[in-house]
From Swiss-Prot:
This is DNA ligase. The lineage of its organism: Bacteria, Pseudomonadati, Pseudomonadota, Betaproteobacteria, Burkholderiales. Residues 610-691 form the BRCT domain. Zn(2+) binds at C425, C428, C443, C449. DNA ligase that catalyzes the formation of phosphodiester linkages between 5'-phosphoryl and 3'-hydroxyl groups in double-stranded DNA using NAD as a coenzyme and as the energy source for the reaction. It is essential for DNA replication and repair of damaged DNA. One of its GO terms (biological process) is DNA replication. The gene is ligA. The active site is at K132. It comes from the Bacteria. GO terms for molecular function: DNA binding; DNA ligase (NAD+) activity; metal ion binding. NAD(+) binds at D41, A42, E43, Y44, D45, S90, L91, E130, R153, E190, K307, K331. It comes from Burkholderia vietnamiensis (strain G4 / LMG 22486). Its EC number is 6.5.1.2. Belongs to the NAD-dependent DNA ligase family. LigA subfamily.
Amino acid sequence: MARTQAEPPASQPDARAAWLRDQLERANYAYYVLDQPDLPDAEYDRLFGELQQLEADHPELVTPDSPTQRVGGAVASGFTPVVHDAPMLSLNNGFSDDDIVAFDKRVADALDKPTDLAGSVTDPVEYACELKFDGLAISLRYERGVFVQASTRGDGTTGEDVTENVRTIRSIPLKLKGAHVPALLDVRGEVLMFKRDFARLNERQRAAEQREFANPRNAAAGSLRQLDPKITAQRPLSFFSYGIGVLDGMPMPDTHSALLDWYEALGLPVNRERAVVRGAQGLLEFFRKVGERRESLPYDIDGVVYKVNRRDEQDRLGFVSRAPRFALAHKFPAQEALTKLVAIDVQVGRTGAITPVARLEPVFVGGATVTNATLHNEDEVRRKDIRIGDTVIVRRAGDVIPEVVGALLERRPVDAAEFVMPTECPVCGSKIERLPDEAIARCTGGLFCPAQRKQALWHFAQRRALDIDGLGEKIIDQLVELNLVRTPADLFNLGFATLAELDRFAEKSAQNLLDSLEKAKHTTLARFIYGLGIRHVGESTAKDLAKHFGSLDPIMDASIEELLEVNDVGPIVAESIHQFFAEEHNRTVIDQLRAPGKVTWPEGPPAPKAPQGVLAGKTVVLTGTLPTLTRDAAKEMLEAAGAKVAGSVSKKTDYVVAGAEAGSKLAKAEELGIPVLDEDGLHQLLEGNTQ
């Protein structure tokens, strides 16, 4: 790589520092991205040392994008949450050729691709194909070309700030190349560790008599989440860009492949193992070629990713739940091994799900030693005919979650014992129930069971339930682990002294939480019902129950037949409600919550059988941001007037209320000829003016 820029003299420290930064970043790019080093190590070290000394003599010359800032900052006490500007969505998975053909057909149908008389698509969809790296997804934020923040994926909405650690990854530019860079760019990609670097790291670990890492993914994830950036700086991490979150100040590239080409021009690392293909056959051919080369690749992958290439077609396809409709991860077959099943226990999940777990003789599979594996549910154990004492096939599904695939019947010992599902929860002793047409058995002691305690408390405190501000997951973890809170009722017994002693919980925070708990004592019946966390009872069903019965006792004592009379309550929901209130442990907690000085709400008469209100029977959709009303406030006003508030626009929609930045729902309403109202129109509608 040519270095034609004139070298400023030492007498010009400002220009000299800028020149040194440029030389070092060019060398980093050639070495870590292009894999074509053009500067001897000794010369790199000399230039780096000169820049360090220059910045020490002139601290005002230190810039955030200086290569010297990669060595690691101060030790952090924890990671700060970061709310992503655009969600970091997961991908739906495909495993077989049939899955890929079905995916292509869904996409082609949704895009109205033309077909011939035989039903074959005559203009196949164009896809961008990439590798699916086995690492850790992160988001990089650049402002006017300068790297300012990095965050992990987290739950897709909120991640953790790992800026100082990511700053140490040499392949990530601290400043984008080129004179024309966007005002804001949110780059999505994967932090990973190459196989050779992983081997060298473990050699160092052995030499230092420290624990070795099981696989490159664990090493990468552990390195990125070090509290001390200096440790991360010593770990050989790499990065590949593959997506985008937010772009401001420049037009979005027309295709995904063009986006990746643009990233390369900006100096961002982009993997070269990619292609643009057409139709299902093109996808499968790419998958097979990559599969043949998988073991020879310098890094671990667990599949490939397909994305509809054209941006306008991606926008048309949109998203479903937490995944895009225009993309799919095609996973490789998982790795398998044989071992002996020595016992079957059951574990209770945070939502009460009872899962049989296989206890295994240790076996190394998929890069890790496995001693436990999921059996999913009772039906799966029966279907696979798995017994205690069997020699079983263990697979790391998706190379992460171990599962028992089946038993080798020819090796079955004569004393192999069948699994028997317990009838009582092994944690709390409550009855285990399994609803009709459901595969999962569940503990019915939702408010009482210690295994479900944290989930029950979090749900009870959330905004749409009791709305206990300040009671986050970390505080709940402490309260439960210190045995200060066993049920939601215990929350209202907490005192200032107890809260003030919690880790990282100042006196002001303690008082704020006490104030929030006091406020939460005055709620509504619907919020209280929703806060109980009854399976299948969401916010809407809780409102229907409160409206139908008027008070809590009739709900607790209602028969399944009486529950079925409630709007939108079917047999499964009715059975779930009935089972919840039939469990004495739950009733005990509810009585504690209703004790004097605890939670209260206005009682009301049962609702009339027919819906009342000026908007009875009408369906309304809200979209965008209204000038003065929050989405929740508008929804409550509409429901109070008898309307049903839906989440999507269809031919059954009567009105759409649109505010600022209304998106596809507004366009769909205009396409279908559905009346569109602003906030003033909403108020007129609520007053009975439906014209």
